[in-house]
Amino acid sequence: MSIRSWPAAERPRERLLELGAASLSDAELLAIFLRTGVAGKSAVDLARHLLNQFDGLRSLLDADQPAFTAQLGLGPAKFAQLQAVMEMARRHMAESLRRDSALENPAQVRNYLKAQLRHEPHEVFACLFLDNKHRVMTFEILFRGTINASYVHPRQVVKRALAHNAASLILCHNHPSGITTPSRSDIDLTKRLKEALKLVDVHVLDHVIVGDGEPLSMVEKGLM
């Protein structure tokens, strides 16, 4: 049955306009994004099928292009549309951070870093560079691969901090395993970077580790 034949109060788009996006299920939100279904399936039916295939919304949103476009009802145009929506969401968060001090809203900072790094299939190390009022200047990925004290070069981090004229920064990297517990190498690396950046009067405010669930703040865990 086509969604158009449903009572207005049950249609996802009408429900969103009346009740707000937060009131909709994952399937209803995805159905609005899909707009149309396929033969024998309404957009909501197709959305439920896709969520089942990917075992949830997160895996669907994180899927690469081959995995995404291999599914019924999806294609390159939908993949491009989804990537554009997600990038706009990341930029919206970045603009909010540029207006306020990162210290005043640490949860927002962690959510932004999670949005930047959660989808990365391999370990990456990045910095969030801040001005003298702790407002975000820019986010930059510096290293890809195994993140440890021998792979991440302090001189490169210092070089980028000086290039951005940053007064402080937040270190961050992801754990593709999903477990955010810092390793001994993570702790040692943080110490080395703090010492190197202190020499050029750039302060390390935190080191955030992104995995499944909430990102971990090494400051809040007393590890810095």
Curated annotation (Swiss-Prot):
GO terms for biological process: proteolysis. One of its GO terms (molecular function) is metallopeptidase activity. Residues 102-224 form the MPN domain. InterPro entries: MPN, RadC_JAB, RuvA_2-like, UPF0758, UPF0758_CS, UPF0758_N. Coiled coil: none annotated. Keywords: Hydrolase, Metal-binding, Metalloprotease, Protease, Zinc. Zn(2+) binds at H173, H175, D186. It holds the Pfam family RadC. A motif (JAMM motif) lies at residues 173-186. PANTHER family: DNA REPAIR PROTEIN RADC, UPF0758 PROTEIN YEES-RELATED. NCBIfam families: PRK00024.1 (NF000642), radc (TIGR00608). Belongs to the UPF0758 family. This is UPF0758 protein PSPTO_0086. The lineage of its organism: Bacteria, Pseudomonadati, Pseudomonadota, Gammaproteobacteria, Pseudomonadales.
